[in-house]
Design a protein with these regions (language model features):
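Ser/Thr/Pro- and often Gln-rich low-complexity regulatory segments
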Residues: 17-117, 184-227
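A eukaryotic nuclear recognition-module signature that targets compact all-alpha binding cores
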Residues: 114, 118-126
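Short helix-loop boundary/capping segments
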Residues: 123-185
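Bacterial N-terminal signal peptides that target proteins for export
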Residues: 1-5
Length: 227
């Protein structure tokens, strides 16, 4: 059975659509878990997805005896544009040492427990709320973060006409402690007086020979900076 998008076998709609977990070999199912903390809303968001063979393969709904829980509570099923996923969301104050557990039972009766932990909040060293930035020269933003986390920093500007946002983002891969916005890119910000500075720490890992993927994200509350 191929993971390509033209597949129509074993009850699967297509490798780009949605199918049922009981219709595939359980050893071919890719498990993908995401744990995200949104600091501004104090919300924990967990999601789980299951795909045939790889992340581009058929999105699978857990059917038959298969099930998924987060923190011992069943996750809610949703299907958006033929993509099946399971979600859980609730309010909680962030605590550094908290552990979270996804528990998945496949159709062969095997149970997998996957621990996840929210990354620590990156600490900005060169900017703070109310800082002013100059757009006629390169802008280096330094931070302190766990060296296993990648950190993405965005400058976001709200459109005055329709309320949408534009973002200019730079990512520091794990081990780096700064990002640089070049003056050429910053020149596009001349139309705004204030910007939101958004910071996100992310760690990713692959487990069990690539059959399990885990993403853990801390989304810091944005701060205002001025031009």
């Amino acid at each position: 059975m191929s993971g390509g998008c033209s597949l129509l076998l074993a009850g699967l709609i297509s490798a780009c659509g949605s199918g049922q977990s009981e219709d595939v070999n359980q050893n071919t199912i890719l498990q993908t878990y995401t744990l995200r903390y949104k600091e501004a809303a104090r919300r924990v968001l967990a999601s789980a997805e299951f795909h045939y063979e790889n992340r581009f393969g058929t999105s699978l709904r857990l059917t038959g005896t298969s099930a998924i829980t987060f923190q011992n509570q069943p996750m809610s099923y949703q299907n958006v544009f033929s993509r099946s996923s399971y979600v859980s969301e609730y309010t909680q104050v962030f605590r550094v040492d908290d552990q979270y557990i996804f528990r998945y039972r496949n159709n062969d009766g095997f149970v997998y427990e996957q621990e996840a932990q929210i990354p620590q909040r990156p600490l900005l060293l060169t900017l703070s709320s109310g800082s002013r930035i100059e757009i006629d020269r390169d802008l280096a933003i330094r931070f302190a973060a766990d060296r296993t986390d990648s950190v993405t920093i965005c400058l976001a500007a709200d459109q005055r006409t329709d309320g949408t946002s534009q973002r200019w983002c730079q990512t520091a891969e794990a081990g780096r402690d700064f990002v640089i916005f070049e003056a050429e890119d910053l020149a596009e910000l001349r139309a705004w007086d204030e910007l939101q500075l958004e910071v996100e720490a992310r760690r990713q890992r692959s487990i069990d020979g690539g059959r399990v993927e885990v993403q853990e994200v801390f989304e810091a509350a944005p701060i205002l900076v001025y031009l």
